[in-house]
Amino acid sequence: MEGLSDVASFATKLKNTLIQYHSIEEDKWRVAKKTKDVTVWRKPSEEFNGYLYKAQGVIDDLVYSIIDHIRPGPCRLDWDSLMTSLDILENFEENCCVMRYTTAGQLWNIISPREFVDFSYTVGYKEGLLSCGISLDWDEKRPEFVRGYNHPCGWFCVPLKDNPNQSLLTGYIQTDLRGMIPQSAVDTAMASTLTNFYGDLRKAL
């Protein structure tokens, strides 16, 4: 399991990568989709031949409640309509784990079901929390799924200054879905997935 000989430094490197994304200047992003409650932007990824997506919206709940629903655990399967299974393969200290999860087909199954094996880390960030992840090269594969790969991704959640009962949730996602999929289909799916994620989460809270 490459890269996990030193979990603490692996987690710190991942966290620092996400903080770097969080400081990218606004003029580097292009709007991919906008709804009443959520905006999704994108820019070319430096990790692979695809896009880094940024999503942002206000959620009417406390930071810890929101992140508890997002990070790996029993809450996530209850509300995330894209996720079809989630197993914790290994637990480490300091809010780190390895999880395997599967996603449903999308766009009338142009994008077939996917499987991911990710390292996940949740850590304090300013007055809030950051829950971040990255895929691992895991040998065991299931033939009924295409193995996707998440380059560094994560969710920053901080309380609003003027109303601490509301939180600003900002996500950074760069998923290589792999397989033979037109880029236009990937772009449509990613933008819709992110806006749906906020809708599902709001209903669950």
Swiss-Prot record:
The keyword Transport applies. It catalyses: cholesterol(in) = cholesterol(out). Keywords: Lipid transport, Lipid-binding, Transport. GO terms for molecular function: cholesterol binding; cholesterol transfer activity. Disulfide bonds: none annotated. GO terms for biological process: cholesterol import; cholesterol transport involved in cholesterol storage; intracellular cholesterol transport; positive regulation of bile acid biosynthetic process; positive regulation of cholesterol metabolic process. GO terms for cellular component: cytoplasm; cytoplasmic vesicle; cytosol; endoplasmic reticulum. Pfam families: START (PF01852). Residues 1-205 form the START domain. SMART domains: START (SM00234). It comes from the Eukaryota. Involved in the intracellular transport of cholesterol. Binds cholesterol or other sterols. This is StAR-related lipid transfer protein 4. It comes from Homo sapiens (Human).
